[in-house]
Each structure stands twice: as C-alpha cells, then as structure tokens.
Amino acid sequence: KAVKYFYNLAVLPAYLRRTHAFYVGLASDMLLTKRSVTVLHDIRPLVMDTDKGFFRFKFWVHCLSTKWFAQRVFTVSDNQRHLISEKLGIPLNKIGITYNGWEHMKGVTPDESIFEKMPGVQKGEYYYALGSLAKHKNFKWIREVARRNPDKTFVVAGGKDLRAFGDDNEAKDTHNVFYPGYVSDAENAALMQHCKLFLHPAVFEGFGIPPLEALALGAPIALANATCLPELYGDTARYFDPYDYDVDLD
C-alpha cells in the first residue's frame, strides 16, 4: 500500500504534468493533481459506524483529496450524489452519475455443481442472498426471518465471518440457513438462476450490484426499501422494511 500511495501522490502527478495527460480514477483514489476526475462509489465510512477508526480516517483523507483536487466527481446513484454533496460540501453540479452495469453476466456459464455441496438445498425452493456479511448488509434480517419461517430454506453466499450477525452465540448455522462461503461467478449464477426469490436486505448501498445480476439472470428480487435501492430498481422489485422480521415472503 505504501507503493500505491507513493505512486498516487508523487509519481502520478509528475507524469501527468510531464505528458499533459488527464487522470480518470475509478476506485476512490487519493489525489494530488487537478488534472483529474474520480469516482466515489459510496461514502459509507463517513455515515455509518461500521469501520475501524484508522480506516475511517484514511477514507476521510481520500474524500478530502477528491474534494480539493478533482475537477469533477462521479458516483453511482443520485442517492449517493446528494449524500456526497451534503457530507463533503461538494456542489451538486460538480457531481455526475454513472450507473453500474450487468453485462458482465453474459459471459458467465452457471456452475450447477454448487448444489452438490448443499444437498439440503433444492432448486427453485430457496431464498438467496449474496454479499459480504458486513454489518450494513443487514444479513441479520435473513437470520431472523429464517427463524420465523422454519419451513423455508435460505442460502447466504459471500464472506463467512458469522460474527457479523452480532453475538457469537447467535451466529451459528441453522437447519434452514446455508452458508456456502465464497462462491465463484459461475456458482453464483447458478444460485441466482434457480432461487425462488433473491433477497437484498442492505440498509446502506452506493448502488447494490447483486440484485442487478439476479435480474439479468431472470430471478425475481425483493429489496430493502432503504438507501438507493428504490431509486435504482423502481418497479422491478418487491420492497420490505429491513427492520421488519415478520415480512411475508410468499
């Protein structure tokens, strides 16, 4: 990481001056050059207490460098556009929107061998969710809904740190919730294609790509009525209160 910072703060500005080039940063890069535009995908660390102190400080520095140096800032939803303007004091007319895409799913061939790893999961009979188990993804909602619906099956793929659910004593596999851990793009495609409903209970998102991938593969989706999700998915989705555990999934 030290090499990355040295490149961004010293090598890159010198190169841009020497070649009269213009820099487009797509990953919230720290900047010390005005010959640039950059993308802030979201500013969650500034609005949610879900990250460690040093990471939050480092992210603040990244955002301030964007505010001071970038000629223009892009983000991935109007929700984030207004949030960035509010929290960082960047004028709205300096912030553009460029949405994420789904076309990468065209090149993915579903790998149905994933079902061999979960013999208790039947095609077309499970609810599926994908993402890291970070707190803002709110996968606690799925665990609580699963407890209230013991006759339904849930699959949650992604990082497998179950402590993200809160109390370690509560973070245990249950008879109707399956955690395959990390899945490949091909395995994910198979799980999306055959799910009864794709669930996305996140309470904060800059965009939320997994529901878009699920739609691209023909899966029905149900999303939290929070953050940018209603803006982006409109009437293509069902919505639920991410703090209501008695929701009707049928």
Q: Predicted regions: what is each one?
A:
Residues 1-250:
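Carbohydrate transferase catalytic cores enriched for Leloir-type hexosyltransferases
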